C-alpha cells in the first residue's frame, strides 16, 4: 500500500470524500478548488486521495461501507436551524466565547444553567440538555475542560455518546451541530472530530445537520 509517509487523509476526511461522491455533489465538472473547499483540505492531501483512492478504501473499509447518509452539510446559521436539538462544544469553566457566546446571547435563559453545571457538576465528557424559549433543545457538549485551544477528543467522544443516549431517551430525532465544531477556538482537528460525530451518529436514524456559514 503506497501512501504518503505523513498522510493527512484521516478516516473522517476520507469518509467525507466518499459521502460527497455518493450524494451526487461531486462530478467531473467541478474543479479541484471546489472539491478541496468542500473537504476542507489542501492540494497535497486532495492529490493523495485521488492517487491512492483504492488504498484508502481498503484501509478505511469499515468506514467506507458504513458512510452515513443521515449526516449532511448545509450552508446556514446553526442558531436558526429547525432541528429538535442544536449543539455546540463548551468548556467546563463557564467561559463562553466565539459561537458559545453567540448562543447564550441569543438564548440567555440557558446561560445560568450552564454556569451552574460548570460550578456544581464535573461535566467534562458529558452533555447538558436545556429547553430554549423557542421550544428547541440546546446541547452543551463538554468536550474540553479549559477555555481556548483545549479540545479533548476522548471527552468529545464521550459527550457525543451521552448526547445520543439522551436524545434516544427523549425521542429527539434531529440535531444541528456547527461545521468545524471544536476546531476553531477549541484548537481541534475537524477531520478527527467529524470522524467522532460519524462514529456516534452514523449508525443511527437521528438526522444530523452540520451547519456551515457561507463565506
Language-model segment annotations:
Residues 1-67:
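An anion-engaging/catalytic patch
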Amino acid at each position: 500500500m503506497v501512501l504518503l509517509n505523513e498522510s493527512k487523509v484521516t478516516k473522517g476526511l476520507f469518509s467525507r470524500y466518499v459521502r460527497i461522491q455518493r450524494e451526487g455533489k461531486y462530478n467531473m465538472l467541478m474543479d479541484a478548488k471546489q472539491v478541496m473547499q468542500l473537504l476542507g483540505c489542501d492540494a497535497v492531501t486532495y492529490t493523495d486521495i485521488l492517487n491512492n483512492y483504492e488504498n484508502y478504501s481498503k484501509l478505511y473499509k469499515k468506514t467506507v461501507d458504513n458512510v452515513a447518509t443521515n449526516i449532511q452539510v448545509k450552508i446556514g446559521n446553526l442558531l436558526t436551524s429547525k432541528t429538535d436539538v442544536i449543539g455546540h462544544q463548551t468548556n467546563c469553566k463557564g467561559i463562553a466565547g466565539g459561537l458559545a457566546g453567540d448562543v447564550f446571547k441569543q438564548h440567555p435563559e440557558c446561560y445560568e444553567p450552564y454556569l451552574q453545571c460548570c460550578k456544581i457538576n464535573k461535566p467534562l465528557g458529558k452533555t447538558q440538555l436545556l429547553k430554549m424559549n423557542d421550544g428547541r433543545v440546546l446541547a452543551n457538549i463538554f468536550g474540553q475542560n479549559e477555555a481556548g485551544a483545549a479540545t479533548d477528543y476522548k471527552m468529545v467522544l464521550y459527550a457525543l455518546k451521552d448526547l445520543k443516549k439522551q436524545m434516544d431517551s427523549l425521542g429527539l430525532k434531529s440535531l444541528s451541530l456547527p461545521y468545524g465544531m471544536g476546531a476553531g477556538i477549541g484548537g481541534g482537528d475537524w477531520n478527527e472530530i467529524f470522524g467522532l460525530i460519524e462514529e456516534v451518529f452514523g449508525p443511527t436514524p437521528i438526522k444530523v445537520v452540520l451547519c456551515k456559514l457561507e463565506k
